[in-house]
């Protein structure tokens, strides 16, 4: 028998890899490419991995994915799509307060459960009024009441089927002449549960189901389109009223209080205080103000990269923390300001401290691949915020353009001069609103068209699940528990190891991710 073989039982297993504590013990600044996670034992399928995770103290998401409040990433279309797939979007504030609040309102109106403030018309309104409402709101199924208001007697409903083939000369026709009358309507009584109402709607094969009280007065309505959305998007992030969750960004200055008021009126579920360096008297004062005026509104503070920064914001009362400084693909803060921290170290250090107080952490920036998402979650982050990864998708703001035959969309950092010139909100984020000379902390560029996130986000979700499967963690909470207990093991990578772990040795190749 060869002398290098040891005979006997197989019970002995040598220690292998580093715990997270050991990985970050030497004060090295590590980012996601600097380490790998060692595989564990698989006894479940990838689809069984539970990705439920906390966004804030009181808000939980079924998918740990968030879109960044950047003006080339998140407006209503992105926020709606992210919420439908179990995440959440944060509407940027590099715009007027009114525009931002209206974007939030679009998200909240997209799916509503019981609609208690629908568009209502009276029999004396015209077909033209219905067409105008369709242009403004995107639908034409409108209940008709005696006075044209909620709480009035229901007398009928007008749908697209009632007016589709009317000539333009008939647009002045009164709704009383074209509406489907009350006697032909299927309705549900006030007090019915949403589940019961949906069952009635499904059986009726109608597009809308009016809810009426004992006096036959309209008190609410539910839509068949919402029933379809429930079927097609089972992971959707919703509030207690069955509306999609929506976040919004605000600054930390006095005039941001007006913006905050409009956002809360529009229905924003959570506010992120948008600052490149969150450990400031301005942010602490704003947290105190919000918690005093809107005690039930969830507030995310940041950005921070150290436990000391996190402490001040946690003491002020934040419900979540956004971690990252200078690590985004369009960010030059570390280069220009000599301030920041490699993202892997930042996430681990802040998450390890914040968990003692029940404050979830968002890993914001530096995410280039689904593997980076898994690593961020394995270091203690509850959710991951994405900018460049979602830029240039169909849902991202902006128009496509062509350069050298490639379809592109603009993507810029909120610290770029381009963004600062558009609105003072970007200047305030970087404490530059009063400066004569603006110091750019970001760049402006373009990214190749990625298509819809309706395909991209499911790929990310599946990738996270498969990553957790290889690790041996059946949920994100188990993943974090394994990390903090020391069961999860890591290993540093040399530059040669990083090259080895990528595509190499080929003359040419095509990299298709999904």
Swiss-Prot record:
Mycophenolic acid (MPA) is a non-competitive inhibitor that prevents formation of the closed enzyme conformation by binding to the same site as the amobile flap. In contrast, mizoribine monophosphate (MZP) is a competitive inhibitor that induces the closed conformation. MPA is a potent inhibitor of mammalian IMPDHs but a poor inhibitor of the bacterial enzymes. MZP is a more potent inhibitor of bacterial IMPDH. K(+) binds at residues 326, 328, 331, 500-502. Its cofactor is K(+). It is an enzyme of class 1 (oxidoreductase). InterPro entries: Aldolase_TIM, CBS_dom, IMP_DH, IMP_DH/GMP_Rdtase_CS, IMP_DH_GMPRt. It comes from the Eukaryota. SMART domains: CBS, IMPDH. Pathway: Purine metabolism; XMP biosynthesis via de novo pathway; XMP from IMP: step 1/1. The active site is at residues 331, 429. Pfam families: CBS, IMPDH. NAD(+) binds at residues 274-276, 324-326. Its EC number is 1.1.1.205. Belongs to the IMPDH/GMPR family. Homotetramer. This is Inosine-5'-monophosphate dehydrogenase 1. It comes from Rattus norvegicus. The gene is Impdh1.
């Amino acid at each position: 028998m060869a002398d290098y073989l040891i005979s006997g039982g197989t019970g002995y297993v040598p220690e292998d890899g580093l715990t997270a504590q050991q990985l970050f013990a030497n004060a090295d600044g590590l980012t996601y490419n600097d380490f790998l996670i060692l595989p564990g034992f698989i006894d479940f399928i990838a689809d069984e991995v539970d990705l439920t995770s906390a966004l804030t103290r009181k808000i939980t998401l079924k998918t740990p994915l968030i879109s960044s409040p950047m003006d080339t990433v998140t407006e209503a279309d992105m926020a709606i799509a992210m919420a439908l797939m179990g995440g959440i979007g944060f509407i940027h504030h590099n715009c007027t307060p009114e525009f931002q609040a209206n974007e939030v309102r679009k998200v909240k109106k997209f799916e509503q459960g019981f609609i208690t403030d629908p568009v209502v018309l009276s029999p004396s309104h015209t077909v033209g009024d219905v067409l105008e409402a369709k242009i403004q709101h995107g639908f034409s199924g409108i209940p008709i009441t005696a006075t044209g208001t909620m709480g009035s007697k229901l007398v009928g409903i007008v749908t697209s089927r009632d007016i589709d083939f009317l000539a333009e000369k008939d647009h002045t026709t009164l709704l009383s002449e074209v509406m489907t009358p009350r006697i032909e309507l299927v309705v549900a009584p006030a007090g019915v549960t949403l589940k019961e109402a949906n069952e009635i709607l499904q059986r009726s094969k109608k597009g809308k189901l009016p809810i009426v009280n004992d006096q036959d007065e309209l008190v609410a309505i539910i839509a068949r389109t919402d029933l379809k959305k429930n079927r097609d998007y089972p992971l959707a992030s919703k509030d207690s009223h069955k509306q999609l969750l929506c976040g919004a960004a605000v600054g930390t200055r006095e005039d941001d209080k007006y913006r905050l008021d409009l956002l809360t009126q529009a229905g924003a579920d959570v506010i992120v205080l948008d600052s490149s360096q969150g450990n400031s008297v301005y942010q602490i004062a704003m947290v105190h103000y919000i918690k005093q005026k809107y005690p039930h509104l969830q507030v995310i503070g940041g950005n921070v990269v150290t436990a000391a920064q996190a402490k001040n914001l946690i003491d002020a009362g934040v419900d979540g923390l956004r971690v990252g400084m200078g690590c985004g693909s369009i960010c030059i803060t570390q280069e220009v300001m000599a301030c920041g921290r490699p993202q892997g170290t930042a996430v681990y250090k802040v998450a390890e401290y914040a968990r003692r107080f029940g404050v979830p952490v968002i890993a914001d920036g530096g995410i280039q691949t689904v593997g980076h998402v898994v690593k961020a979650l394995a270091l203690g982050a509850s959710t991951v915020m994405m900018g460049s990864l979602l830029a240039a998708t169909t849902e991202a703001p902006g128009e496509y353009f062509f350069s050298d035959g490639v379809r592109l969309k603009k993507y810029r950092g909120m610290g770029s001069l381009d963004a600062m010139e558009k609105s003072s909100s970007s200047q305030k984020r970087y404490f530059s609103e009063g400066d004569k000379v603006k110091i750019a902390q970001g760049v402006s560029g373009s990214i190749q068209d990625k298509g819809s996130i309706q395909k991209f986000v499911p790929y990310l979700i599946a990738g996270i699940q498969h990553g957790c499967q290889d690790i041996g963690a059946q949920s994100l909470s188990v993943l974090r528990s394994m990390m903090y207990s020391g069961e999860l093991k890591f290993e540093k990578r040399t530059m040669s190891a990083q090259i080895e772990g990528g595509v190499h040795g080929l003359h040419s190749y095509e990299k298709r991710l999904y």
